[in-house]
Amino acid sequence: MGSVNSRGHKAEAQVVMMGLDSAGKTTILYKLKGNQLVDTLPTVGFNVEPLEAPGHVSLTLWDIGGQTQLRATWKDYLEGIDLLVYVLDSTDEARLPEAVAELKEVLEDPNMAGVPFLVLANKQEAPGALPLLEIRNRLGLEGFQKHCWELRACSALTGQGLQEALQSLLHLLKSR
């Protein structure tokens, strides 16, 4: 779909955000879009927003609903994407195995061959949030050697870590 170049030309990229329901995908989308906190409802289907990123990169961000009944459709959004952003709730330790299983299933899809991904460990501002190192170990990210990836801590609520996440996203796009 899109391409990112280093010659100063405007580049475009398709970025899909996935994760379990209530992970914070929609809040992150709109916080990045306008630095605003919005009231959200569970996403049925998807939200899509353009975002002009630093370095003359035009992103199309797809926020895909994460409820159990919607996950069967996730594969429909993977064809031709440039990057996957996988959002997880750092406070929901009980659902971490489910989040890991869903991420693995997405990454095994043939459309994901060579596609980089960024994992956002959201809700880091909350008491009881799992530390980044523990999340990294539990996700088994080192096992995904066919993909370039990064893991970032963030808080959609406060905005902490989102600009760094955007920089990681751009770095991963350029690694393709």
From Swiss-Prot:
One of its GO terms (biological process) is hematopoietic progenitor cell differentiation. SUPFAM superfamilies: P-loop containing nucleoside triphosphate hydrolases. Keywords: GTP-binding, Lipoprotein, Myristate, Nucleotide-binding. The keyword Ion transport does not apply. A lipid is attached at residue 2 (N-myristoyl glycine). GTP binds at residues 19-26, 63-67, 122-125. GO terms for molecular function: GTP binding; GTPase activity. PROSITE patterns: ARF. May play a role in apoptosis. May act as a tumor suppressor. NCBIfam families: small_GTP. Belongs to the small GTPase superfamily. Arf family. This is ADP-ribosylation factor-like protein 11.
